[in-house]
């Protein structure tokens, strides 16, 4: 049975391309690629043509997310599997695939209403070295682990878990977090490769489709530089620097120009063979700026 191998790319609808251009390059260290298209720019994190497309729009939210399959045979098998499960799948035109810089593309929607894509054959610009937007000591963790992970809006956690299992992901609840109101949050984490998780959900009601995108540096010093820049620019920090219990990553969460969160990280462990759960993080991750959907005690 075919399974997706990585979270390959994101498309984001943004209202302020200029703000994003500066943030992505000067804060995160991503390479900004402007090909003269009036409505979009691209962000590189490695040798792919892009990992993130920033598309000028009327909203600030996730526009789509792309899950990779290995080849045309696996792609066709996945389309068939999803269709047989009663999920509406539209195989995209050649023009739409070219727009995504892939060889094959299909579109569908997950149970939370999040625009989802499966694809194969991304364009890799091996002739163009990655050039970070600011000085960096290392690179981003991508390769077979994909872009990073996303926390998505899902009203029905079980339906979402079943959907992502169809795509080939594995996982379960990894935290039981006791909230001030007496309720217990039980976020659900799923992986499809060595990255500890590529998608998660179950944080409760969300205004936007996406709560945060996490990406990871290969070098601790790059996380430290990013943290310094965020503090110098007085960018809202929702969760202070801390270490997660599940993936052991050292991270912090700060606002992006679209009003949701990017999680900057380093040092995550690989996905374990068996599941376990935690009641709190190892240290840090104290709540700071409110209103970004991470007002939970970690």
UniProtKB/Swiss-Prot annotation:
Pfam families: BphC_D1, Glyoxalase
Positions of substrate binding: 149, 196-197, 212, 253
EC numbers on record: 1.13.11.56
Induction (record text): By naphthalene-2-sulfonic acid.
Record flagged with keyword Calcium: no
Domain VOC residues, every copy: 6-121, 146-267
Annotated keywords: Aromatic hydrocarbons catabolism, Dioxygenase, Iron, Metal-binding, Oxidoreductase, Repeat
Enzyme class, UniProt record, top EC level: oxidoreductase
Database matches in Gene3D superfamilies: 2,3-Dihydroxybiphenyl 1,2-Dioxygenase, domain 1
Binding positions (Fe cation): 149, 212, 263
Function: Involved in the naphthalene and naphthalenesulfonate catabolic pathway. Catalyzes the meta-cleavage of 1,2-dihydroxynaphthalene (1,2-DHN) to yield 2-hydroxychromene-2-carboxylic acid. Can also cleave 1,2,5-trihydroxynaphthalene (1,2,5-THN), 1,2,6-trihydroxynaphthalene (1,2,6-THN), 1,2,7-trihydroxynaphthalene (1,2,7-THN), 2,3-dihydroxybiphenyl, 3,4-dihydroxybiphenyl, catechol, 3-methylcatechol and 4-methylcatechol.
Subunit structure: Homooctamer.
Name of the molecule in the record: 1,2-dihydroxynaphthalene dioxygenase
Organism: Sphingobium xenophagum
Gene giving rise to this polypeptide: nsaC
């Amino acid at each position: 049975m075919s399974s997706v191998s990585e979270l390959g790319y994101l498309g984001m609808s943004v209202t302020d391309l200029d703000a994003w251009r500066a943030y992505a390059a000067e804060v995160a260290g991503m390479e900004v690629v402007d090909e003269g298209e009036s409505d979009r720019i691209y962000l590189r994190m490695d040798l792919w043509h892009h990992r993130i497309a920033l598309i000028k729009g009327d909203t600030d939210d996730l526009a789509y997310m792309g899950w990779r399959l290995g080849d045309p045979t696996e792609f066709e098998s996945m389309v068939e599997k999803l269709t047989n499960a009663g999920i509406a799948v539209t195989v995209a035109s050649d023009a739409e695939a070219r727009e995504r810089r892939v060889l094959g593309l299909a579109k569908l929607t997950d149970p939370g209403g999040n625009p989802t894509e499966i694809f194969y054959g991304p364009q890799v610009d091996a002739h163009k070295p990655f050039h970070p937007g600011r000085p960096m000591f290392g690179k981003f963790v991508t390769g077979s682990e994909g872009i990073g992970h996303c926390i998505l809006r899902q009203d029905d956690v079980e339906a979402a878990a079943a959907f992502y299992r169809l795509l080939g992901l594995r996982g379960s609840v990894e935290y039981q977090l006791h909230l001030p109101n007496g309720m217990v949050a039980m976020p659900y984490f799923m992986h499809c490769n060595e990255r500890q998780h590529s998608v998660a959900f179950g944080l409760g009601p969300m205004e936007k489709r996406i709560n945060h995108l996490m990406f990871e540096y290969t070098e601790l010093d790059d996380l430290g530089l990013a943290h310094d820049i965020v503090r110098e620019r007085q960018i809202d920090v929702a969760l202070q620097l801390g270490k997660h219990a599940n993936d052991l990553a050292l991270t912090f969460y700060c606002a992006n120009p679209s009003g949701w969160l990017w999680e900057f990280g380093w040092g995550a462990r690989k996905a374990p063979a068996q599941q376990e759960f935690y009641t709190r993080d190892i240290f840090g991750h104290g709540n700071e700026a409110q209103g970004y959907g991470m007002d939970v005690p970690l």
